[in-house]
Amino acid sequence: MFNKIFSWFENRLNPYPESNPTTPKKGLFRFIWSSITGMKGWIFLLAILTVGTGVMEAVLFQFMGTLVDWLGTFTPERLWQEKSHLLIGMAALLLISIVWGFLASAVHLQTLQGVFPMRLRWNFHRLMLGQSLSFYQDEFAGRVSAKVMQTALAVRDTVLTLANMFVYVLVYFITSGVVLVALDSWFLLPFITWIILFGLILRTLIPKLSKTAQRQADARSLMTGRITDAYSNIATVKLFSHGSREATYAKRSMQDFMVTVHAQMRLATSLDTLTYATNILLTLSTAILGIILWKNGQVGVGAIATATAMALRVNGLSRWIMWESARLFENIGTVNDGMNTLTKPHTIVDKPQASPLQVKQGEIKFNDITFAYDPTKPLLNHFNLTIKPGEKVGLIGRSGAGKSTIVNLLLRFYEAQQGEITIDGQNVLNVQQESLRRQIGLVTQDTSLLHRSVRDNIIYGRPNATDEEMVLAAERAEAADFIPFLSDSQGRKGYDAHVGERGVKLSGGQRQRIAIARVMLKDAPILLLDEATSALDSEVEVAIQESLDKMMENKTVIAIAHRLSTIAAMDRLIVLDKGQIVEQGTHAELLELNGLYAKLWNHQSGGFLSESAE
């Protein structure tokens, strides 16, 4: 029965809403308010339940004081005769408070505690997936993931602290004030004095804790980013024997983090000591005042018991308030830190009226394109290029000539400052990004695989592919000969073996063959090859070239290679220099022209451009 009740509360909120998330607004409260869309009703319900809990607890203290007076006045028989209805009513209230407390706990713990941060992580993660490549070039991947995880928890704790703790405390103190006035208004004096002193303590120390928490969140993000950076590039670290250097590099960020920890703990100790002192003052002053009022005949023993019990309750509450306040501002610091990243708008977005790209022929046009990574240094300046349907074009030029930039602009990883790029007459700015990239297959020299199984990496090209289609793609990519012999630390073998982060368990050639298999399985009408066979040895390259040739049939192809022999057979070669087309034609035509292409060809050593040519 209880499991069904728990399940009902647990299923009130969907942790994975299907609606597309919107970028949260800047500003602490605007950020939080826009992040909790879809959960506000349950948060409000929790606040209402908390109000009831605070009222019932204060009423219970008042009743216990009254009961003390009754016990000193009535005999047991007379007490039951005259006050039985009140005793039964209070017993009923206690039973109701149990159910009420269960509802408050169920809403808090079952409905909100776990689902709240997961829902935020789901939305934040999808927002980060929509960021451009330039965003990730400026950020540590580990730092971004840490902010997604930590900010979600911090938003939850901030909201629930306000809805639970602060609402409870506010209602409890208001109700207690009413009860104390009913006993004797003088009892308010020590409580008001305590509130003023405690408020001054919090006002003085909590802002300092907040600033320290902000510095600590920044230091934690930097520390996490540096550590993750070392792990992500562990091969480079070991290759240059810089383990100690990386440890020292991370240690500096750890030391900065510890400075913030010590500062935070000093403030915490001061806050704890001052709070304890004010609590002692409240308890003593309430007891002494109660005795004085009792001596003067103004109150009974029950009133003293009620006031003293409330003072002791405040004693316990104050430590809860103190640490929850400290945690609140620590969480606010974390939210502020994460907000700087999570509120960054997407720089490349689909237009509201964007339609899916329809590729029927595969004609590509670059019309008057001007683009620069640095606005002061244009890379492409009024660039024009038309690639006919089904044409195979090779891009050639020194490093920095703009070859990869042309590919990135076609994929809309970046957007040109001027001009337009069209595919079959459709401006890439006017089509949906996902549909654009679904129609393009890309193999690059920097092949990154997901830290998943070989199967998952290959079918990434076409998730609905059958196992037979996946294996056929692996065979065509000359990958089927080594995949059956792969294994991982969990005992998984072959296509089920995991390849490690970025495919680190595989050789460069193996990674590239799996990447080629993935693109072969995708079978997109437009194919981009950016040094697609650079990591393959000559024997494997010869074996795979036939499959690549077959894959290129009836497709529009743009290929980039420093090994000119691999693209010499293309329909047309485009020679770039400083973002401009300086030569174009077939291999034979360009050699006869005796220009830059001929110079690069003559400088080749072993099929690659030599350093002097670069």
Swiss-Prot record:
| Classification via Gene3D superfamilies | ABC transporter type 1, transmembrane domain, P-loop containing nucleotide triphosphate hydrolases
Cell membrane found in the keyword field = yes
Q: Name one GO molecular function term.
A: ATP hydrolysis activity
| Alphabetical list of InterPro entries matching this protein | AAA+_ATPase (IPR003593), ABC1_TM_dom (IPR011527), ABC1_TM_sf (IPR036640), ABC_transporter-like_ATP-bd (IPR003439), ABC_transporter-like_CS (IPR017871), P-loop_NTPase (IPR027417), Type_1_exporter (IPR039421)
Q: What is this protein called?
A: Uncharacterized ABC transporter ATP-binding protein HI_1051
The Gene Ontology biological process annotation of the record reads:
transmembrane transport
| Keywords, in A-Z order | ATP-binding, Cell membrane, Membrane, Nucleotide-binding, Transmembrane, Transmembrane helix, Transport
What's one GO-annotated cellular component? plasma membrane
**Superkingdom of the organism of origin:** Bacteria
Give the PANTHER family listed for this entry: ATP-BINDING CASSETTE SUB-FAMILY B MEMBER 10, MITOCHONDRIAL, ATP-DEPENDENT PERMEASE MDL1, MITOCHONDRIAL
Q: Where is the ABC transporter domain?
A: 364-603
Main localization is membrane
